[in-house]
C-alpha cells in the first residue's frame, strides 16, 4: 500500500452539486494505483504535474504510471437526495442540510480516496459556498474569504492523521451554541430554532471529556468538538473526529424531555466521545476489529454515566440495554464471532449489531472484573499511548492489559472473541457437592457445541468463590451442608445459569442485577424448551410485588412479547401490581419502570387503555414520561388515524414525533396499513424511521396479517426503497428479522416466502427470521 501523507481538497458547491480539485501527497513505488471512487465524475488526473492515464473499473479509479510525490484529481460530485449515506441532503422544513456519513466505505462517494481505515492521512479542506451558509468540518475554521458571485470560501485547519471514514462536511444555516469555558471548545449545531434544546448535551459532553481525559490520561486532541443535529440520519450517531453527527433523538433533550430521552442522549454523547480516543486516535487496522471500536465505546459510555448520573444505575442499564439483547442474538445458530473476518467491505454493515456492541461491551466488563478495574484501566492507557495516531488490532489491547495485570488474558479473550455463542452453566447440587457443567446455549438444538473458558463467580452459603471452567464440567466439594448458591455474581459474566434447585438460588441474597439476570435466563430457557411454562410462570410469580425497576421492565417486556406473538395477556396480575407499586415513584428508575408498564398494559388491556386514554385531551400538559403510553391508549381505544397523523405532522421535535409513531403503529384498524406505507414511500415519515415503523407494525397482532400480506405482495417496492435510503441491504435485513412475527400463524408459508426472496446480502437475517419462527411455533405448543 502507498504511504498517504496528506489530502488537500477544494470543493465548490452550487446547490447540491460540487466541483472538486484534490491533491494527494504520497510515497509509492507502484506502477499502478487504485483509489476508491463511486458516483463521481472524474475530469482529469495529473501525476507530478503531468496528465496521466486513468480509467474507472467498478468502484475503483485506476491510475497508471509511477507517482513520485503528488497526484491531482479534478472531479465532480453530487449530494444525494435519495440516500442517507455518503454525501447527501437531509431534508427539513422545505430546506436541506448537506451532510456526510462515511463509515464504513462511503467516503469514496465524496472524493476519490484510499478508503481503508489503515491508510491514514492529514486532510486540508477548503469549501466554497453561497454567502449566508455555514460550513462545519473536523477542524476549526482557519479563515473565511470573500469571493466573487456572492460566495465565500471556508478554509479549515489541517487535521491530524486520520482515516477517511472519519472525515466530515456539513453545509447549512446552522444555529450554534457553545461552551468556551476551557479546551476543547464544545459547540452544538442544529437546524434553525432547535439549539436551545442542546444545553443538556453540551453539559454532558463537557463532563464526559473531563472524565475521559482523566481515565485515559491523554488530553482530547483537537481544539474543538462539534455535536451536530442531522435531520435525517441512518445511524444513531457517528464519531467523525471533532464533528460528531447525531439524529435528533440522540442529541436534543431539555426539561420537558422524558427520562428515557435524557438517558439516551447522555449515553450516545458519551459513546461517540469515547471514540475520539478509541477509534479515532487509535484506529482498527481492518474491519475485522470493528467490534473493538464499538464495544469499547459502549463499555466506556456506561462507565462515564455512572460517574455523571449515579441515580441512573448505569451498571444495571448495561445489563438491561446491552447484555440482554446480545445474549438473545448470540443464542441463534446464525450468530457470528465477535471478531468476524470481513473480506468484502460491503459485508461490514452486517457487523453493526448487538454482537459487536452489546456482547463486546459485556466481554470487556467480564475481563475488567477478572483482572481488576485499575489493572484494566492501566492496560488501556498503555495501549492508547503505544498506538496513538496509528492503527492496532485486538491482540494489541489484550497484550497491554495482560502486561498491566501481570497475568495473561489472551487465551481467555481468544475463546470469547473467536468462537460464536456462549454457554449455559448447569448447576447441580447433590449431598455436599456442586457440579458445574457447560454447553453452548442455543434456542434451537442445532447440535452445535463449544467448550468455553468461563470465569465463573459464585457465592455458596454467602461465601464468595471463583472457578475458571475450561472443560465440560467441574465439581466442588463442601465441608458443610448446602443452604444457598448463586452463580454469576453481579451478572458480570456473559453466560446463563440453569439451577436444578431454584430454591437454593432464591435462598441466597440475590441483588438487583442477579435478579435481572435470573429472570432473563429463565425466559430464554422457556424459549429454548429447557423448562416448561409452569416453571417460567413460577419464576415470574416470585416477582409480582418486586420494586426492582429493571426486573419489572424485563418481565413486562417478556409478557408483551407473548402478547405480540399470541394476542394473549398472560401477565395482567403482574402488570396491575406493578402499576400500583410504581405509580407514585419519585426516582428516575421508578418512573422508567412505570412508563414501561403502563405502555405495555395499554396495548394489552382495553379496559386499562380506556381509563388512560382520558388524559389524551390534556396531552400537551401531561408528564412526558407517560405521554407515549397515553398516545398508545388513545390509539387502542379510538382507532383515530387522522388525529394522530395531524399531531405527527404538527410536531417539530422528533422526540414527540416518535411517540406518535408508536401510537399509530398500535392502531387496531387494518385499513391503516396501506396508509402508513404510503406515508413511508412519499417520505412523509422520515426515511430514517422506516425500519422502526415497519417493525412496530409487524409487532401489532391486530393488524399483523395485513402487514405481512402487504410486505409479501410489495416486497420488491419495499426492497428498492429501503436499499436506496440506506445505501444497501442492511436496512432491509432488519425488516426481514421482524417478519419472524409473520410466521406465528403460518410458519411454512413465511419460510417459503423468505427463501424465495433471499439474496446473498440478507442471507443471515433471513436465517435468523426462520429460526425464530421455529422457536415461536414450538413455544405456541408449550403455552397454556
Swiss-Prot record:
Keywords: Aminopeptidase, Cytoplasm, Hydrolase, Metal-binding, Metalloprotease, Protease, Zinc. Coiled coil: none annotated. The record marks 357 as: Transition state stabilizer. One of its GO terms (biological process) is proteolysis. Its EC number is 3.4.11.-. One of its GO terms (molecular function) is metalloaminopeptidase activity. One of its GO terms (cellular component) is extracellular space. Gene3D superfamilies: 1.25.50.20, 2.60.40.1910, Neutral Protease Domain 2, tricorn interacting facor f3 domain. Zn(2+) binds at residues 271, 275, 294. SUPFAM superfamilies: Leukotriene A4 hydrolase N-terminal domain, Metalloproteases ('zincins'), catalytic domain. Its cofactor is Zn(2+). The active site is at 272 (proton acceptor). It comes from the Archaea. Belongs to the peptidase M1 family. This is Probable aminopeptidase 1. It comes from Saccharolobus solfataricus (strain ATCC 35092 / DSM 1617 / JCM 11322 / P2) (Sulfolobus solfataricus).
